[in-house]
């Protein structure tokens, strides 16, 4: 599902209730937060037809507050990452092993790397190679040449990090990156996420 659908459900049905001052106070009492989360889960399951095996999210980054709540109410979800040029899935992880905030690990027969001196700490472009990667753009050798590195990796245009377990974390788009006056990297996607949580 596209995150906007999930976010719309949470923002219209769940957040108005849990943001009420009385509910916020009750959730601070030990043991009561879990009772409220169970009720939220029950209502969400009912809204989705009574049973959810897995919610697979893709197409855009998920709002952090929505993801936190999905985790808290124990909805089985995962986030996949892909693009048309890669047929389309690049990374995914089973819900039982999924790391919050990530888009999973490279799928079978695909390799991902971060074009960075330190892919765990310094954001770089996510690059892909594997059986599902396109050969090139139809009748457009210039675009094809620009899309690939000299050693044959597809430039996704997405920026990210990876952890020691090979989970990937998308931070933004290279075309959207703003360099601040002090040299700080500013990702509009992170600002948008914060504004969406207000």
Enumerate the predicted regions with their spans.
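Short polar/acidic secondary-structure junctions
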Residues: 83, 117-119
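Conserved ATP-binding/catalytic segment of the ANL
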Residues: 106, 120-180, 185
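Gly/Ser/Thr-rich phosphate-binding loop
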Residues: 1, 5, 9-98, 111
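Phosphate/diphosphate-binding loops
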Residues: 190
């Amino acid at each position: 599902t596209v995150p906007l659908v999930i976010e719309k459900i949470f923002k219209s049905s769940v957040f108005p209730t849990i943001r009420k001052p009385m509910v916020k106070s009750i959730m601070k009492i030990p043991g009561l937060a879990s009772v409220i989360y169970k009720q939220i889960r029950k209502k969400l399951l009912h809204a989705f037809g009574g049973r959810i095996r897995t919610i697979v999210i893709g197409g855009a980054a998920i709002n952090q507050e929505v993801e936190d709540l999905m985790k808290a109410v124990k909805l089985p979800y995962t986030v996949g990452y892909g693009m048309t040029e890669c047929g389309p899935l690049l990374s995914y992880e089973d819900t039982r092993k999924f790391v919050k905030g990530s888009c999973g690990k490279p799928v079978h027969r695909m390799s991902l790397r971060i074009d960075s001196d330190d892919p765990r700490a310094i954001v770089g472009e996510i690059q892909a190679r594997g059986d599902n990667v396109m050969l090139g753009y139809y009748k457009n050798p210039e675009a094809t040449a620009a899309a690939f590195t000299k050693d044959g990796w597809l430039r996704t245009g997405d920026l990210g990090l990876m952890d020691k377990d090979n989970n990937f974390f998308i931070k933004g788009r290279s075309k959207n990156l703003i360099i601040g006056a002090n040299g700080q990297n500013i990702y509009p996607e992170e600002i948008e996420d914060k504004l969406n949580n207000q």
